[in-house]
UniProtKB/Swiss-Prot annotation:
Keywords: Ribonucleoprotein, Ribosomal protein. InterPro entries: Ribosomal_bL28/bL31-like_sf, Ribosomal_bL31, Ribosomal_bL31_B, Ribosomal_bL31_sf. One of its GO terms (biological process) is translation. NCBIfam families: L31 (TIGR00105), PRK00528.1 (NF001809), PRK01678.1 (NF002462). Gene3D superfamilies: Ribosomal protein L31. Part of the 50S ribosomal subunit. It holds the Pfam family Ribosomal_L31. PROSITE patterns: RIBOSOMAL_L31. GO terms for molecular function: structural constituent of ribosome. Belongs to the bacterial ribosomal protein bL31 family. Type B subfamily. This is Large ribosomal subunit protein bL31B. One of its GO terms (cellular component) is ribonucleoprotein complex. It comes from the Bacteria. It comes from Corynebacterium kroppenstedtii (strain DSM 44385 / JCM 11950 / CIP 105744 / CCUG 35717).
Amino acid sequence: MKKNIHPDYHPVVFKDASTGHQFLTRSTATSDRTVEWEDGNEYPLIVVDVTSESHPFWTGAQRVMDTAGRVEKFQRRYGNRLRRAKK
């Protein structure tokens, strides 16, 4: 591999802003903020808005959209135009 072309890949702690959940992983992201981890070492801290701990898809709090109502609304609005264009 070529030297000096790859970014610095190091341990980083990511923190979910809404839940406070933290996890240690590796990343090229950097930060001036640090946090002491469970192993006693200090790591850069990156605060993110959404993680799997707070995203509706992963928490099971997602909403099911009313697709039938949206299709009917589309048909009412554009249905006649499409039929006339085919003739």
